Amino acid sequence: MGEARRGQNPHHVLGYGFHGTTLPNSMASANLFEQGGGGGGGAAYFGELEEALVHQVATLRRRAQQTATTTTSHHGHTTPFSTAAAAATATATARPPATLDIFPSWPMRRSSLPTPKDGCSNVTADTTDSESSSKNNGDQGAAAADMASQFDQIPQQQQKQHKKMAASSTHSDHRMTKTLDPKIMRRLAQNREAARKSRLRKKAYIQQLESSKLRLAQMEQDLERARSQGLLLGGSPGGNTSAGAAMFDAEYGRWLEDGGRRMAELHGGLHAHLPDGDLRAIVDDALAHYDELFRLRAAAAKADVFHLITGTWATPAERCFLWMGGFQPSDLLKTVAPQLDPLTEQQVVGICSLQQSSQQAEEALSQGLEQLHQSLAETVANGGSVVNEASLGSFMGYMALALGKLSNLEGFVIQADNLRQQTLHQMHRILTIRQAARCFLAIGEYHNRLRALSSLWASRPREILVADEGNCGELSIAAQPSESQFSAF
């Protein structure tokens, strides 16, 4: 049994050692051993061959295990081949060489020479095993080459996927833009229109600021020119004013600014054809604004009555029409009445009666003020002399009497302001809402034109002033003959 098994093992593993040998050569070498060495020499040769084949089988198994380990690591993506050439080189390295490891120095064992029939079967089995081993090695090389090609194709596939994703996202964005809700599209259009209007308003506002800056610079130049010529708007040059007068000037400046805004509201309400209720509120506000002016004037009269009477708070053109420190009611009615047409008969009668009563009150106040002036002049004239010590006492007495008479001047100014205020209230009662709006608007425009006239007068060039002075001299010379004609009178 031992010899039979020993004879089978070498022939079973023979296919692993003889890579590339053919069956006739094997049979010829077997016959050669049988003929040359007899039975003992063939047994010795096959004993050595058995040892070599066993060693070769162990070596081939280890190489097969290493090849399987390398293939597993390739599939686990630890050390992939970069190219197909590298995979082919690894496959060629893993293939065992077509030689036998035969060492004659090993101990030789005797065995019986197998029969020719057994030898033929063993050689056939070895040839089959050799073919299967070659096929397995070829399959492993092809798998490694396919694996390397797959690793080379991975970056290209990733790039293609990125391109597809980008194209799909762009397509989806276009589709979302096309399928937006009409409300959203309309809202976006409204937002764009609002932004455009906002930019236009900003541009117009900047232009308005620039034009206002230019006008302010022009006004400063005009004011400086007026000061150099000795003409000051709303005040006497170099005059000392009291604290009450300075406070009134500041309050009056703010009152003028508020009056400009109220005039704009009246103008807008008339052109917009507002209802009577809304327009009445604007008219009542304008009337209350004039009541505020009369309150300021009463406080200024108590602080410094001469400041109101002299009209230093007004412009030069307005001073020409002052009456007791303000406008004359009858003259104002004559100026405003033509702009209130059409008027009913009842309104005409009411305005005429108001004008007559105003004239009567004005005459009474004017007569009283004239008497006060005459009395004050007599008191100051008969006051004695300051140089004479004997008459110094009488002088101080007359001065105290003159101061008492001057205090009556405050009463005249307050009564004149009351007459002005009552005239405005009576006009408000007689006229309709729209007529009253036109009345207050006409009064405001009248005083604005007077102030504008003063500004133009103050801003005249000096050459025109010199020419006017020359013309006045010529007129005075030309008027001398006419004066001589009426010298007797």
Swiss-Prot record:
Keywords attached to this entry: DNA-binding, Nucleus, Plant defense, Transcription, Transcription regulation
Residue ranges constituting the bZIP domain according to the UniProt record: 181-225
A molecular function GO annotation: DNA-binding transcription factor activity
Assigned GO CC terms: nucleus
Gene Ontology biological process terms, A to Z: defense response; DNA-templated transcription
SUPFAM superfamilies for this protein: Leucine zipper domain
Stretches for region Basic motif: 183-203
Polar residues bias: start-end ranges: 121-139
Compositional bias segments (type: Low complexity): 87-99, 148-159
Region (Disordered): 87-181
InterPro entries: bZIP, bZIP_sf, TGA_domain
Subcellular location field: Nucleus
Annotated stretches, region: Leucine-zipper: 209-223
PROSITE patterns: BZIP, BZIP_BASIC, DOG1
Compositional bias of kind Basic and acidic residues: 171-181
SS bond partners: none
Purpose: Transcriptional regulator involved in defense response.
Entry similarity comment: Belongs to the bZIP family.
This protein's name: Transcription factor TGAL11
Organism: Oryza sativa subsp. japonica (Rice)
Name of the gene: TGAL11
